[in-house]
Amino acid sequence: MKNYFDSPFKGELLSEQVKNPNIKVGRYSYYSGYYHGHSFDECARYLHPDRDDVDKLIIGSFCSIGSGASFIMAGNQGHRHDWASSFPFFYMQEEPAFSSALDAFQRAGDTAIGNDVWIGSEAMIMPGIKIGDGAVIGSRSLVTKDVVPYAIIGGSPAKQIKKRFSDEEISLLMEMEWWNWPLDKIKTAMPLLCSSNIFGLHKYWREFVV
């Protein structure tokens, strides 16, 4: 099978890859999938492209997604762990013995990834998870709980390792929402965006963006 990507050193914008209408993407978010060979659509597991009554995968702007990251969709996929059996009898109606089975399917809600989120290679995001702006998800993490903004998490199941900045700095970043700025403002602020000077960036925002 031909590799969708030409190089491991270059990602492709999601806006130029995604064909599934149930995946919503923001500007400049990209997937770097060279080591797995497929486009981003295949990262969204069990997400039906031809139905509009399913949970959506929503990805914000300026997100970086590593090769082989996966987003498990389709709710509980017909498995009820609180029933005597988790087996999806309902989906095997061709077997007469299963004809009275109830539909065990439950939606999990949309999976929502914030803005400026970095998701490492082969991380797995479970159904209905919400990941806050600025979060960092370590490679091969299994994300089973919502992630607060600007947290760094890792492990299986994933746990918070630390926050990227102080609570005050995070509050300023959330107030500024730099990912929504027009490109000319981002261009001028680039030296600050490429630094740890959050207070300086906030000062720029107050003077030139608001």
UniProtKB/Swiss-Prot annotation:
**Which GO terms are recorded in the biological process aspect for this UniProt protein?**
response to antibiotic
* Residues annotated as the enzyme's active site: H79
Q: Which InterPro entries match?
A: Hexapep, Hexapep_transf_CS, Trans_hexapeptide_repeat, Trimer_LpxA-like_sf
- Statement: the UniProt record of this protein carries the keyword Acyltransferase: yes
Q: Name the enzyme's class.
A: transferase
Q: What is its EC number?
A: 2.3.1.28
Record's keyword terms, sorted:
Acyltransferase, Antibiotic resistance, Repeat, Transferase, Transposable element
Q: Which domain of life is it from?
A: Bacteria
Q: Which GO-annotated molecular functions does the record name?
A: chloramphenicol O-acetyltransferase activity
The reaction(s) annotated as catalysed by this protein in its Swiss-Prot or TrEMBL entry are: chloramphenicol + acetyl-CoA = chloramphenicol 3-acetate + CoA
Q: What does this protein do?
A: This enzyme is an effector of chloramphenicol resistance in bacteria.
Which family does the entry's similarity section mention?
Belongs to the transferase hexapeptide repeat family.
Record's protein name: Chloramphenicol acetyltransferase
